[in-house]
């Protein structure tokens, strides 16, 4: 695991881990939209992915969702449904396909140990699948959260087919080579109380500026790491709830700009 992604893993571990997400599961179960599990061939492996379709009469853009270090949780599946609610086909690969864990610590350790070539291969396989979805319009973007947010930047540097990248509180690149191949705008969503991650933003801004790339980070004051999930909880504090609402409002505007 790279130094930056390891830093994200540590930051994620400091967030209250995901116990039973009954509130997220209830929202998902009550959704009118179609969601399904699919199997995708990735080399000699088969991975699972969760796909949710929007209710619309025309073809839609597809957003690849890279989950947190907790794995493909009910919250991540619920977020896919919320993307579909906003007209997007969302697909989230389970990067721990074939593994089960009794607690979040087990998932954290397993994800931290995943080989980077395997992660890239699984994301590539999911991207290829996504671009062939009959209801898709050929536009592909990527988003990720925490550990997945760090991978958003990394994967944007690997996949020239991406039209946009949305990184939520993931560490940003620290070397020119890590942004050299980025061919799409990168939008960052960061928590004010998350200096461990935010300290990486200025370097990335300079690297992207030198490379002539678009990078627009926004820091949401008062929020903590993981605010997109924490702010959705029934007992969320006001700072996280407000940051989530503001981030979603911005994200919806950006999603509408996808071709």
Task: List each language-model region with its residue ranges.
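Bacterial N-terminal signal peptides
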Residues: 5-16
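Serine-hydrolase catalytic machinery in alpha/beta-hydrolase-like enzymes
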Residues: 24, 28-32, 36-131, 228-233
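Alpha/beta-hydrolase fold nucleophile elbow
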Residues: 134-145
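Gly/Ala-rich beta-loop-alpha elbow adjacent to hydrolase catalytic centers
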Residues: 144-148, 152
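Short beta-strand/loop motif that positions the catalytic acidic residue
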Residues: 182, 188-190
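Acidic catalytic loop of the alpha/beta-hydrolase fold
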Residues: 193-198
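C-terminal catalytic histidine-bearing segment of alpha/beta-hydrolase fold enzymes
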Residues: 209, 214-259
């Amino acid at each position: 695991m790279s130094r930056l992604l390891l830093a994200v893993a540590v930051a994620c571990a400091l967030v209250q881990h995901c116990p039973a997400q009954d509130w997220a599961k209830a929202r998902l179960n009550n959704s009118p939209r179609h969601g399904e599990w699919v199997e995708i061939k990735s080399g000699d492996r088969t991975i699972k992915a969760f796909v949710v379709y929007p209710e619309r009469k025309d073809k839609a853009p597809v957003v690849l969702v890279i989950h947190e270090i907790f794995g493909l949780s009910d919250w991540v599946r619920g977020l896919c449904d919320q993307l579909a609610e906003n007209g997007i086909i969302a697909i989230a690969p389970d990067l721990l396909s074939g593994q089960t864990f009794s607690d979040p610590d087990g998932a954290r350790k397993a994800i931290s140990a995943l080989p980077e070539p395997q992660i890239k291969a699984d994301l590539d396989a999911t991207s290829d699948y996504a671009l062939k979805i009959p209801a898709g319009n050929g536009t592909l973007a990527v988003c990720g959260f925490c550990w997945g947010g760090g991978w958003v930047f990394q994967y944007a540097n690997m996949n020239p087919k991406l039209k946009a990248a949305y990184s939520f509180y993931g560490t940003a690149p620290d070397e020119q080579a890590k942004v050299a191949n980025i061919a799409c705008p990168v939008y960052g969503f960061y928590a004010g109380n998350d200096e461990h991650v935010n300290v990486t933003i200025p370097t990335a801004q300079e690297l992207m500026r030198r490379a002539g790339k678009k990078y627009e980070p926004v820091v949401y004051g008062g929020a903590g790491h993981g605010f997109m999930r924490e702010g959705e909880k029934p007992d969320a504090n006001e700072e996280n709830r407000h940051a989530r609402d503001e981030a979603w409002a911005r994200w919806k505007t950006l999603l509408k700009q996808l071709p």
